[in-house]
């Protein structure tokens, strides 16, 4: 007898025994109590139709109400499923709004001479066209060049001019802006001069920007449509020249209209005005707002180090600069950032091949949300309409020839007249918007719950509470059964 009690002791004091004793103290409802619990829930829940099933004594009515409830639940599930599918397709709508204002900010205007270099300098360094094409390659959006850096003449020049600075050469021997080349400048009735323009390097060499930077944006506004910037430029054809082989055979001015917060981008986007022409440009301000992924393709988390305002063009320049600086140990002067400037030998041996490598491998891509440079979330553009007329007239030719002390032929072959005005004092906002927001989705789902089942969030909580309680009882019941089976099948312990 004593031996039997000692053998039972460890089993009762084991972990399973303790769990069983603890669970056995939790009272489980009897089958009658469980039926009463189910019935009370059915007649008290705010889920419409269930109490009609529970309270009706007529079997036919029970079946009818059961069919109604099941049908309503089926329709509810179908409607909610379709709403969720539609939401996760991330649909968008586009709204267009026109805002009228008393004053409107004037854009930046960057212009360049189509004849990029001084004739005298080109006569001494004829290779400059080829060299500049290699150097300015960093500004092009997409291009994979052939093996064009292997010209013997170019290689000889690079080898014999190790200290040659193409930056200083272009700055000193490219197009310049002074009172001779800027014959007349007027902005909204006020005279402007070369000091109001900022020098920038582009693929066209020396270029000049009016109204560039955030510090001047606030003061350069116009309050009357039809009045803006007027420029009369002298391109000095006899002093500046270009290589007609790659397509620089025109004479005149190329210009681009852009946001004061963004750098000029000429790659296929410039407007041009030939000599002997008056270009009348009317513009409108268009603001575009894109949604972030997954509704749109923009990424608001991307910030640029060298630009206050994000743009795809600025992002691509920083991306190229990062790869070139890492792989070549230098930085092209046309790209943003701080670093040792690349010399011509670096351009030949490293920068140009790396640019081809970047393009082939897709290291600097643009457009979609997962690209290196997705579309900006906000951008301002200036769609332009341009009209030309012959300039100057015969009488104006005589007047300008006398004023500038030049021949009439010189006036016709060198002067370019550009006028840029707003068509209206308004701007258009094109905004991409979420077709279905989270509050709208919740409201729609709530409406479906109310329409088909007369339910609400409180009803859902009631159902969750009912299911949790029922599951808890079933779980405790089966757990006790399992523990009892384990103790029965465990071998007896012997001393």
Swiss-Prot record:
Catalytic activity: Na(+)(in) = Na(+)(out); Li(+)(in) = Li(+)(out); K(+)(in) = K(+)(out); H(+)(in) = H(+)(out)
Extent of motif GAS motif: 454-456
GO MF entries: bile acid-gated sodium channel activity; ligand-gated sodium channel activity; proton channel activity; sodium channel activity
Any Gene Ontology biological process: sodium ion transmembrane transport
Spans traversing the lipid bilayer: 62-82, 460-480
GO CC field: apical plasma membrane; plasma membrane
Stretches in topological domain Extracellular: 83-459
Any single Pfam family the record assigns to this protein: ASC
Effect of residue 443 to C/S: Novel constitutive but weak cation channel activity
Free-text activity regulation comment from the record: Inhibited by the diuretic drug amiloride. Inhibited by diminazene. Inhibited by extracellular Ca(2+).
Domain of life, per lineage: Eukaryota
Cytoplasmic side: 1-61, 481-495
Free-text tissue specificity from the UniProt record: Expressed by cholangiocytes (at protein level). Detected in brain, liver, duodenum, jejunum, ileum and testis.
Annotated InterPro entries: ENaC
Family, per entry: Belongs to the amiloride-sensitive sodium channel (TC 1.A.6) family. ASIC5 subfamily.
Subunit and partners: Forms homotrimeric channels.
Protein name: Bile acid-sensitive ion channel
Gene designation: Asic5
């Amino acid at each position: 007898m004593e031996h039997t009690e000692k053998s039972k002791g460890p089993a009762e004091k084991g972990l399973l025994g303790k769990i069983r004793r603890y669970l056995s103290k939790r009272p489980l409802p009897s089958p009658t109590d469980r039926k009463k619990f189910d019935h009370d829930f059915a007649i008290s829940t705010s889920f419409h139709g269930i109490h009609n099933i529970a309270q009706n004594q007529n079997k036919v009515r029970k079946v009818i109400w059961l069919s109604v409830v099941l049908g309503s639940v089926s329709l509810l599930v179908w409607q909610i499923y379709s709403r969720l599918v539609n939401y996760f397709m991330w649909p968008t709508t586009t709204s267009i709004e026109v805002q009228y204002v008393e004053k409107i900010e004037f854009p930046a205007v960057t212009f360049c001479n189509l004849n990029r270099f001084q004739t005298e300098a080109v006569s001494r360094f004829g290779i400059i066209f080829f060299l500049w094409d290699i150097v300015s390659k960093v500004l092009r959006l997409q291009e994979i060049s052939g093996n064009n850096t292997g010209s013997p003449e170019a290689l000889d020049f690079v080898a014999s001019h190790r200290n040659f600075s193409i930056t200083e050469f272009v700055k000193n021997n490219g197009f310049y802006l002074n009172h001779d080349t800027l014959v007349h400048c007027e902005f909204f009735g006020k005279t402007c001069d070369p000091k109001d323009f900022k020098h920038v390097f582009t693929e066209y060499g020396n270029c000049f920007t009016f109204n560039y930077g955030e510090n001047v944006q606030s003061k350069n506004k116009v309050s009357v449509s039809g009045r803006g910037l007027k420029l009369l430029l002298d391109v000095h054809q006899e002093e500046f020249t270009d290589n007609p082989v790659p397509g620089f055979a025109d004479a005149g001015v190329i210009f681009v209209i852009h946001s004061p917060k963004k750098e000029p981008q000429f790659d296929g986007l410039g407007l041009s005005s030939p000599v002997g022409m008056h270009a009348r440009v009317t513009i409108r301000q268009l603001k575009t707002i894109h949604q972030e992924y997954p509704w749109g393709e923009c990424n608001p988390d991307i910030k640029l180090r060298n630009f206050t305002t994000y743009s795809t063009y600025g992002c691509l320049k920083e991306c190229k600069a990062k790869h070139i600086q890492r792989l070549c140990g230098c930085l092209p002067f046309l790209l943003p950032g701080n670093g040792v400037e690349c010399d011509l030998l670096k351009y030949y041996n490293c920068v140009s091949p790396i640019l081809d490598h970047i393009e082939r491998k897709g290291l600097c891509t643009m457009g979609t949300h997962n690209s290196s440079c997705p579309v900006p979330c906000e951008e301002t553009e200036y769609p332009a309409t341009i009209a030309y007329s012959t300039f100057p007239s015969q009488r104006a030719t005589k007047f300008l020839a006398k004023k500038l002390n030049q021949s009439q032929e010189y006036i016709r072959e060198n002067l370019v007249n550009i006028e840029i005005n707003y068509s209206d004092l308004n701007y258009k906002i094109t905004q991409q918007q979420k077709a279905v927001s989270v509050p709208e989705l919740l409201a729609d789902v709530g409406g479906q719950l109310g329409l088909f089942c007369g339910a609400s969030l409180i009803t859902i909580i009631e159902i969750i509470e009912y299911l949790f309680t029922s599951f808890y009882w079933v779980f405790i019941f089966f757990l006790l059964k399992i523990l009892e089976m384990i103790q029965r099948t465990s071998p007896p312990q012997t001393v």
